[in-house]
Amino acid sequence: ISACLVGSEMCIRDRNSAVDGGNMLLHSFECLLTIDQDGKIAPGQAETWEVSEDGLTWTFHLRDGLKWSDGSDLTADDFVYSWKRVCDPVVAAPYAETVLGMVKGFDEAQAGDLDALAVSAPDAKTLVVELSNPCPYFESLAAFATLSPVQQATVEANGDAWATAAETYISNGPFYITEWVPGSHITMSKNPNYWNADAIKLGSIKFVLMEDSNAAYTAYQSGDVLFIKDVPTQEIPSLQGNPEFHVEPNLGTYYLSMNLEDPAFADVNVRKALSLAIDRDYVANTLMQGTYSPAYNLVGEGWVDTDGSSFNANANGGQSYISDDFDANLEEAKQLLADAGYPNGEGLPTITYTTNDAGYHKTVAEYLQQAWGELGINVEVNIVEWSSFTPMRRNGEYMVARNGWVGDYSDPSNMLDLFCTGNGNNDGKFSNADFDAAMEKAASTMDTAERSAALHQAEDVLMEQVGCIPVAYYNDFWLQSEKITGIWHSAYGYWYFMYGDIAE
């Protein structure tokens, strides 16, 4: 299969610290657990697992005969090393607290005492994890890419460079990288040492790297690639009804990050004004041609509350200051801006909006320029390449930036944790004591009703303080040749090619 999934040249990643590139890398690495075709947790490197009655001890039993792609044995000790490495302050993994913050000894490990992390291997096939508080979704974390194993000998022999070349990129998944041509493609070949290699029909997968969705579309039309993830927006109307065009929801929100260390956004009224001036229905249904849904809270459809119901349906209306009347919202925005000392936008610095040029991002940027212009605010649009965009945003080199998050698991904490003080993915540097306290409560209580209330309280605080500006809820839309069989898409924004095939 030849597929175009990403535009970044920075695609080979250190599994323990990666943030993007997951669509490719899930084919070369496998965690203890994985996600099956129905979106359910399934055995991966671990064949079975159990949790103690108090919810504090998780035990995973590995399969017999696990191997690395170089043919060497893979044992529970490899997971111990890798999970402790995630906590290493030198590695500085952005997801560390998200995936291991509930494990006993995490804080000490983050401070440099890696052996304090309560992860152990009593034998070569058993991994024991002790939690400081129950985590009902921990099995989802055990399927999350950051907790993939990495080969200790290779990492220690090559340092950070281990993850930058195909020959040192030793992995344990159904495929392994055999060729990487920066800016062109990454080729993965079937891993004969994978535990389920007999079920893998494809000999190789070629991931083509293209920054331009129009070029990808041309390649698809010519048959050079059989799958493209980023469909040019102008082509969508003509593709409606085409059996090769697919649209499915995912657990994601398209939102705006404001650099809250910038004095321009110090007043919550300014932040509310920017939010109120956005016509979300117009953005989702007109600009995005109905491929997204309007977002009025951070946590969208599909996220599961503690009782199994929809978290979004139970939302308390954190953005209750936004009415159904957009004209009224616009007038309120103007008043809030005046209350903040910027009547008609006077005195407010020019806002630079930074985004990458893919999908609807440029279209949304131009809309924001016009919408905020209605408030008298001057907006400049800064378009940067994807490979530069994420580091710029993470380093705070922006005023307002496009952002987005697709769930790694269906618990709402996965979305809300982003905004905890000090979180590695908190690009806007939102910091609020009430929010942090609510999230701490959600992480520590064993009562499901209390946990639900705490999570909703956290979202309410985030929305009322406008720690970010939700704009739309994601759907994934893609083109897939009818020649491709056996692949599937998950609500987490991933495509699974490993058990696919090409029909003759």
Give the residues covered by each predicted segment.
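Long beta-strand-rich cores associated with HINT superfamily self-processing modules
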Residues: 478-504
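Structural transition elements
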Residues: 293-339, 358-362
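N-terminal lobe/hinge region of extracytoplasmic solute-binding protein
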Residues: 8-9, 13-53, 170-171
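Extracytoplasmic/peripheral linker and loop segments enriched in polar/acidic and small residues
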Residues: 321, 325-327, 378-389, 414-481, ...
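Surface-exposed binding/hinge segments that line
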Residues: 61, 78-80, 91-153
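Gly/Pro-rich hinge or "lid" segments in bacterial periplasmic/extracellular proteins
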Residues: 37-40, 114, 124-125, 131-200, ...
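Ligand-site clamp/hinge motif
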Residues: 192-237, 378
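Short, small-residue-biased leader/transition segments that mark boundaries at the very start
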Residues: 1-12, 188
